[in-house]
Amino acid sequence: VTNKLMGERVFRKIMGTGYPDSANVKAGSKAIKYHLDYMHWLLDQRRWLAGNELSLADFAAAAHLSCLDYVSDVDWNRSVIVKDWYAKIKSRPAFRSILADQISGFPQPSHYSDLDF
């Protein structure tokens, strides 16, 4: 998901390798919906993605979502449960440096670094 969306929309522009491949963008957009739905299902069953304790799985998934959120590719209205989970991860001190990152030529959306978005 991240490679299809970020690779096409961001990396191609940075590397100067042409315009985004619309088939890859479409596939990535479809895949993120599936993953958000699956995360919703997991978080409906437990507190965190891999169980009832915060784990590396949460940080890994949140890091990918952070990249996609930076370019506004996450529909946070799709799942309040996933949005609340992500807000909890964003509020962790260990995650703050990720939220401070910026990509030249790609302004972050106003909600990106807002912990209570």
Give names to the regions the model predicted.
Residues V1-S91:
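GST-like fold's C-terminal all-alpha helical module
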Residues V71, D101-Q102:
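Residue-level signal for well-ordered alpha-helical positions
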